[in-house]
């Protein structure tokens, strides 16, 4: 039988429900049960599961306990508001005030604490998490059997699984760790979002190494302000969450984290700051990669290459080298393994069908990232620089004007278009972006065009491209769908860009 959701381990020793109740300090149900799994999704229940019925924004998981029981749940974990509905199924019920906050530790217990058998490296920050995770996994691959968990995909050895979110829910995450252990994986590189830290998705995890890339405004629809955002990220650098931190000394929040972290910290600086433990020197940024020398804490010199373009990817590559060195790998061997990584899906990913100009797709979907990518591409562009860019609906509205302004100021042509409008009016989003572009003084502003239809926007920018130019399609990166009014339609920037180029050549 095929079950929805991420994979589960094939073999799990049953845990008595009474043991789980004792672990949480909850009242022991009159009836015991043998628990072999846990899920928060009633549709993904398997026989032997503890079903975590969580309170939600609109519905309560207890509304679905009958479905869970029908699929083979042997017990329910819920809060006081869900207790009566859960008890009505006749299943034993564990009642705690914060079931979401407890299910990570329960999942770890049920699956036999699989994370303890893995080298766990977690990466957090506003930008660069995905790239750094891929680079770390690439370096680890040279000496270990690896796993990867992040925005684009999950990997267990060579098996690839599509990701639903950057960091899985705690119940799924512990199951994934157990599958990795079962299949001989012994090291995992994993993105850790601020949502994951606040919502308890990494409860039950203690990372061997936690990496901090940077912090800039993002997710302001979720966090009240930058202080709240920083506090969320800083949770990863406490003894409950990690053993050692690797922190970007070039970032102002990184320097603050060095002072406030509750675990030992190793610092790195792509800008060559003399106070950092590890620093980059002799940086040469090329059109598709960069080379540099890493100076270590004992003044050792390591030859390094970032397989991705842009100064920001020097920082991501340096972060990966330092994390792997902290994990005990030889730094030069780590750097060589990272240099061999073939690229990261949707991160400065080149689309080449023989056209006489550079065409790339990038996930940049916040102001800092858009500015960084445009500046990096400007350095390697002989002709004109063109960007296609939109802003997602039902997300942080404060970044729309700055993103429109950044595109207009730093590109010769800025084609503003739809990203994932979700439930919002695409034209209203575009009007806000356009207002931002209009604030750029005319003598600093490139040509600005607006197309609601993303495919039309891509076709328009391709039609303008001349030899020596660069075309950047930004915002969606690896994504393979576009969410318009709650309906996700197939849409892959890489394929649409490729087809547009082929049509102009045809």
Curated annotation (Swiss-Prot):
The gene is murE. ATP binds at residues 125-131. Belongs to the MurCDEF family. MurE subfamily. PANTHER family: MUR LIGASE FAMILY MEMBER, UDP-N-ACETYLMURAMOYL-L-ALANYL-D-GLUTAMATE--2,6-DIAMINOPIMELATE LIGASE MURE HOMOLOG, CHLOROPLASTIC. Carboxylation is probably crucial for Mg(2+) binding and, consequently, for the gamma-phosphate positioning of ATP. One of its GO terms (cellular component) is cytoplasm. This is UDP-N-acetylmuramoyl-L-alanyl-D-glutamate--2,6-diaminopimelate ligase. Signal peptide: none annotated. Its cofactor is Mg(2+).
């Amino acid at each position: 039988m095929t079950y929805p959701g991420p994979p589960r381990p094939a073999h799990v020793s049953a845990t008595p429900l009474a043991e789980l109740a004792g672990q949480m300090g909850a009242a022991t149900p009159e009836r015991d049960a043998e628990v072999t799994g846990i899920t928060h999704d009633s549709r993904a229940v398997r026989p032997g599961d503890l079903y975590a019925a969580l309170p939600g924004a609109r519905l309560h998981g207890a509304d679905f306990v009958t479905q869970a029981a029908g699929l083979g749940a042997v017990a329910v974990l819920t809060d006081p508001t869900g207790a009566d509905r859960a008890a009505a199924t006749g299943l034993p019920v564990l009642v705690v005030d914060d079931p979401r906050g407890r299910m990570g530790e329960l999942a770890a217990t049920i699956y036999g604490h699989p994370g303890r058998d893995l080298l766990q490296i977690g990466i957090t920050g506003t930008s660069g998490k995905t790239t750094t995770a891929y680079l770390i996994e690439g370096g680890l691959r040279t000496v270990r059997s690896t796993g990867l968990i992040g925005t684009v995909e999950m990997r267990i050895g060579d098996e690839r699984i599509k990701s639903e979110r950057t960091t899985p829910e705690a119940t799924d995450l512990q199951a994934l760790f157990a599958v990795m252990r079962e299949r001989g994986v012994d090291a995992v590189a994993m993105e850790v979002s601020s949502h994951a830290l606040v919502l308890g998705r990494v409860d039950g995890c203690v990372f061997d190494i936690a990496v901090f890339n940077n912090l800039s405004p993002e997710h302001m629809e979720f966090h009240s302000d930058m202080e709240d955002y920083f506090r969320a990220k800083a949770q990863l650098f406490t003894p409950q969450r990690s053993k050692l931190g690797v922190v970007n000394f070039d970032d102002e929040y990184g320097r603050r984290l060095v002072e406030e972290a509750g675990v030992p910290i190793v610092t790195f600086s792509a800008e060559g700051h003399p106070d950092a433990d590890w620093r980059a020197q002799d940086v040469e940024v090329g059109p598709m990669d960069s080379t540099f020398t890493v100076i270590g804490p004992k003044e050792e010199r390591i030859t390094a290459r970032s397989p991705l373009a842009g100064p920001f990817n020097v920082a991501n590559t340096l972060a990966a080298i330092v994390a792997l060195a902290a994990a005990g790998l030889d730094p030069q061997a780590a750097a060589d393994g990272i240099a061999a990584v073939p690229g990261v899906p949707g991160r400065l990913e080149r689309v080449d069908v023989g056209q006489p100009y550079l065409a790339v797709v990038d996930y940049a979907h916040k102001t800092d990232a858009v500015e960084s990518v445009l500046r990096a591409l400007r350095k390697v562009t002989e002709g004109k620089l063109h960007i296609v860019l939109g802003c997602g609906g039902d997300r942080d509205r404060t970044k729309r004007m700055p993103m429109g302004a950044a595109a207009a100021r730093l590109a010769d042509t800025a084609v503003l278009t739809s990203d994932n409008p979700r439930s919002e009016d695409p034209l209203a989003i575009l009007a806000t972006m356009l207002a931002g572009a209009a604030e750029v003084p005319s003598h600093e502003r490139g040509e600005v065009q607006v197309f609601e239809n993303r495919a039309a926007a891509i076709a328009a920018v391709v039609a303008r491209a001349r030899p020596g130019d660069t075309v950047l399609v930004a915002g969606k990166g690896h994504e393979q769908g576009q969410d318009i009014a709650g309906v996700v339609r197939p849409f892959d920037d890489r394929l649409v860009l490729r087809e547009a180029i082929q049509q102009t050549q045809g």
